[in-house]
Amino acid sequence: KFIRHKDESFYECGQSIGYQQYCVDACQAHGSKEKGYCKAMAPFGLPGGCYCPKLPSNRVKMCFGALESKCA
């Protein structure tokens, strides 16, 4: 259901409708008790990603491509 990045440090989300729900679902599946959301990752040289609050590790789950501007 969720696509792992090649380094397995985060989930990627494809350019599909409902990417915001994907972020919510991916974070929930990863153990986050709070709602995940999209945020910009440009300062880190990465595409937009899903942020999962209050997780000790793997806090960022990625979006990419056309979705990046929507993740700001």
UniProtKB/Swiss-Prot annotation:
Q: Which UniProt keywords apply?
A: Disulfide bond, Ion channel impairing toxin, Neurotoxin, Secreted, Toxin, Voltage-gated sodium channel impairing toxin
Tell me which tissues or organs this protein is expressed in: Expressed by the venom gland.
Task: Kindly state one GO CC term assigned in the UniProt record.
Answer: extracellular space
Q: Which GO terms describe its molecular function?
A: sodium channel inhibitor activity; toxin activity
Q: Where in the cell is it found?
A: Secreted
**Primary site of residence:** secreted
Q: Which residues form a coiled coil?
A: none
Instruction: State the Gene3D superfamilies in the record.
Output: Knottin, scorpion toxin-like
Residues annotated as domain LCN-type CS-alpha/beta: 1-72
Domain comment, in the record's words? Has the structural arrangement of an alpha-helix connected to antiparallel beta-sheets by disulfide bonds (CS-alpha/beta).
UniProt function note: Sodium channel (Nav) specific neurotoxin.
By sequence similarity, the record places it as follows: Belongs to the long (4 C-C) scorpion toxin superfamily. Sodium channel inhibitor family.
Instruction: Indicate what this protein is called per its UniProt record.
Output: Phaiodotoxin-3
